[in-house]
Regions:
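Extracytoplasmic
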Residues: 1-63, 74-77, 81, 90-114, ...
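Short flexible coil/turn linkers enriched for glycine and charged/polar residues
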Residues: 35, 399, 533, 579-581
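Soluble periplasmic/extracytoplasmic beta-strand elements of cell-envelope proteins
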Residues: 39-41, 121, 406, 538, ...
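Membrane-embedded transmembrane helical bundles of large multi-pass transporters/channels
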Residues: 47, 63, 67-70, 78-378, ...
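Solvent-exposed, non-transmembrane alpha-helical starts
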Residues: 47-77, 380-383, 414-431, 546-556, ...
Length: 782
């Protein structure tokens, strides 16, 4: 204020130099700054801050009797309240301005999804993550869940032509989901978008268990009624009174249910045990270091166990209570009779086609599944102001991806009368490191050095005759070394103080906010020295949001500079500074964490898949009492995993946080389908007719469960998030392939093995209908 205020401000801005580019930009090229940023730093734990609390989503609990919490979300709500609601237009006109038409800084290609732009928008990684999570939750609950229930009901009615099946299959599924996810929330487990992957598995297995059991009970009921009808014909022929053919006779219902429990129930038990043991791998910290993935593993274990118990108890009771009878469809049954003959009659053709696709999938496996997990705009719900503002900031300021490295001089101690970080050799070493880091493309850095260079002082007030002196230039002036030289009269004023004292003056000039964001705070009661105890400082490294693959190269280049000429003793102890007692860390922050999580997810997927295959082979060999059938079962599941890269390449699906867990889902449902087919083949016998009947009967149920699960997933096509839509499309395609693998490929492998073994042992063709009977005859005899 006062006379010359604007001139002084202009001088401050001019003195700041390139540092201003980090805070203001001219986006339309008219020479006037029109866009600026205010950078805020927040602590991880907000509980001791003075922000208003928000309601705890968990309500009043023993750990939180007030039902109120202070966290980042509460801070963001408070900041938004201060800016947009409690600010007065006369004090902050910008706070109430809204741009309804595109500005120069908008991405015009996304103009159709960008909301009306507030002139002041709170953005950054934390607000975006909260907004994305809330939007995904709203999409799933408000759009997908109602449509999913509707589509599942329609599909069940279309397949069974009886609305009662919706209650029989839907009730156990809903109970399982409530019990499982309720338990996860009550136990306060970490929840992330990855938990979405557990839903389709539990729904798929729930439908699978319920339909297999329901259809087998109905199949047994029909068989018992046919047997009684034959006996009635004999009684009628002999003139004796006939038995009542009531399908709900207690003895008939009991016989049908017990027989189903001993056959299909056995297969369901094998499936539940196998999938529980297989998914237990996701909970091993040695293989899965990522906590959200372990939460998925726990959810699956609890959910599968609950699904098995609830289905086995409730389905028979609901069938009897509702008096459910499946309306037969002669055309559908006839179609599956024909499909059942495919593995027997054209097994060579099936093997050739499946082998060709599998070989191609192996060829492109590393290319497709080895891709970096993306975080593109397609995976963000449209219309999020915080995301659009962050995208705009990344483009205009070439920043937004905030990284940093730590300089730690604690071991160096107090030298030259200053705190460790204030020591001039430390500051000079930081400047040298910044020069190297800034030479990396798309990279700029900010540190204490830049702040000291940007702040200019009136040297005349200090008794020193310099013009336009920055704090950095002042503490590096050569006159500090010549202050006692009589031949340098210009340096005599420097004798009244010392360079070290001037360094402290320079640092004390910085505001508490600047110092708190760049250095660790003074430790009251810990520090035993007169000078401040600043021992660490942050050097911020800014980059725009770019593809992780490209950003990974930049991260590697920066880390090479931070390692220096010698190797590091861990990520926090590198010697690039070249000073005793001073170390620096490797790069940390948003980009390195994203890259490490990306690598961790890929490694965990690979390790869990391999571990699951080995464990399931052992478990199924024991449960089936046949290593051969265990290998056949895993082969059928494995080909689906190997077909996934083909779908991703030709379907244009990328690897993102949603699709990253698809392999786990397919494994869970694929193993279940294959176990049911194998168990039915064991019941019917490994003969051409037995295999054909197993496919015709059990394969039909597998088709019904697949169709029902896909109907539920089809609701995902109506969500507004392209990344989620890709997830559900790929999920449905892989479930269909799992159906093909279990119902066609698996029986074909059994037929091919039997045929080859028979010929090698000199017994002639195994597919000899003269000895084993025709397929149709085999159906009737069974």
């Amino acid at each position: 204020q006062g006379s010359g205020a604007q001139e002084r401000i202009d001088q401050y801005v001019e003195n700041a130099g390139s540092l201003m580019e980090s805070f203001v930009r001219d986006t339309d090229g008219d020479g006037v700054w029109d866009t600026g940023v205010v950078i805020m730093g927040i602590t991880f734990d907000m509980s001791d801050t003075e922000i208003p609390p928000r309601d705890d989503p968990k309500g009043i609990t023993e750990d939180n009797p007030s039902g109120q919490i202070k966290d980042h979300k509460a801070f963001l709500s408070y900041a938004d309240l201060l800016i947009h609601e409690e600010s007065r237009p006369e004090d902050c006109e910008l706070c109430h301005r809204v741009y309804e038409s595109p500005t120069h800084s908008w991405d015009l290609e996304r103009a159709d999804v960008i909301p009306n732009r507030e002139a002041v928008t709170i953005t950054g990684l934390t607000p975006v993550l909260h907004d994305v999570s809330d939007a995904i939750y709203d999409e799933l609950m408000d759009v997908m869940l109602p449509l999913s229930l509707l589509f599942v009901g329609i599909m069940m009615f279309a397949l069974h032509r009886n609305a009662k099946v919706i209650l029989i299959c839907g009730t156990p599924i809903i109970m399982t989901l409530f019990i499982t996810f309720g338990t996860i929330v009550i136990t306060d487990r970490m929840l992330t978008p990855m938990i979405i992957s557990a839903g389709p598995i539990l729904v798929g297995l729930g439908v699978d268990y319920a339909l297999h059991l329901t259809n087998r009970i109905e199949e047994n009921r029909v068989r018992i009624l046919e047997q009684r009808a034959e006996r009635n014909w004999a009684l009628r022929r002999d003139g004796q009174p006939e038995h009542d053919l009531d399908p709900w006779d207690p003895s008939i219902s009991l016989g049908a249910t017990v027989s189903a429990a001993l056959t299909t129930g056995h297969a369901i038990l094998l499936s539940a045990l196998t999938t529980i043991i297989g998914f237990s791998v996701l909970m091993w910290p040695s293989i899965v270091p990522i906590a959200p993935m372990r939460t998925v593993g726990l959810t699956l274990l609890l959910g599968i166990f609950t699904t098995f118990i609830v289905s086995m108890v409730m389905v028979p009771a609901l069938v009897q209570l509702l008096r459910y009878r499946k309306t037969p469809s002669a055309a559908f049954d006839s179609l599956w009779d024909k499909i059942g003959e495919v593995p027997v009659r054209v097994y060579l053709l099936v093997l050739i086609i499946a082998g060709a696709f599998t070989a191609y999938g192996v060829m492109i496996l590393d290319d497709e599944l080895g891709k970096e997990i993306t975080g593109s705009a397609d995976e963000v719900p449209p219309g999020l102001a915080s995301y659009e503002a962050l995208r705009e900031y990344s483009i205009e300021f070439q920043g937004g991806q905030t990284n940093m490295f730590i300089v730690d001089a604690e071991a160096r101690g107090e030298l030259n009368g200053t705190a460790p970080i204030r020591d001039l050799p430390i500051l000079d070493a930081i400047e040298r490191m910044q020069i190297e880091v800034n030479n990396v493309p798309n990279t700029t850095s900010i540190s204490l050095v830049d702040i000291l260079k940007a702040i200019h002082v009136d040297s005349q007030s200090l008794g020193i005759n310099l013009v336009s002196t920055s704090l950095w230039d002042l503490i590096h002036d050569e006159c500090w070394d010549e202050s006692q030289n009589p031949f340098r009269p210009d340096c005599l004023p420097y004798a009244i103080t010392s360079r070290e004292a001037m360094v402290n003056v320079a640092f004390d000039t910085l505001s508490p906010e600047i110092r708190s964001m760049l250095m660790n705070a003074d430790q009251a009661g810990v520090c035993q020295q007169s000078s401040p105890c600043e021992t660490k400082t942050l050097v911020y490294v800014n980059q725009p949001y770019i593809a992780l693959k490209e950003a990974g190269v930049l991260r590697g280049a920066i880390d090479d500079h931070l390692r220096g000429e010698s190797s590091c003793n861990g990520p926090l102890s590198c010697s690039a500074l070249g000073l005793d007692g001073a170390v620096n860390s490797l790069l940390t922050g948003g980009l390195p964490v994203s890259l490490d999580i990306n690598e961790g997810i890929h490694d965990a997927q690979r390790d869990t898949t391999l571990s699951t295959i080995l464990i399931l082979l052992v478990v199924m060999s024991i449960l089936f009492r046949s290593p051969r059938m265990a290998v056949f079962t895993m082969a059928a599941v494995g080909v689906v995993v190997l077909w996934q890269p083909i779908l991703m390449r030709f379907g244009g699906v990328n690897v993102n946080v949603f699709t990253a867990m698809i392999g786990t889902i397919v494994f869970g449902i694929g193993v279940d389908d294959s176990i049911h087919i194998v168990d039915r083949i064991k019941d019917e016998g490994e003969s051409p007719a037995g295999i054909a009947k197993s496919v015709a009967r059990c394969g039909q149920t597998v088709f019904e469960t697949t169709a029902t699960t896909c109907a539920g997933l089809a609701a995902g096509l109506f969500v507004a998030i392209p990344g989620l839509r890709n997830f559900f499309v790929l999920m449905m395609a892989l479930l269909f392939l799992a159906l093909v693998a279990s119902s066609i490929v698996l029986p074909t492998i059994v037929v091919a093995y039997r045929e080859l073994a028979s010929r090698l042992m000199g017994r002639g063709p195994w597919l000899d209908y003269e000895e084993s009977g025709s397929l149709s005859a085999g159906f009737k005899s069974n």
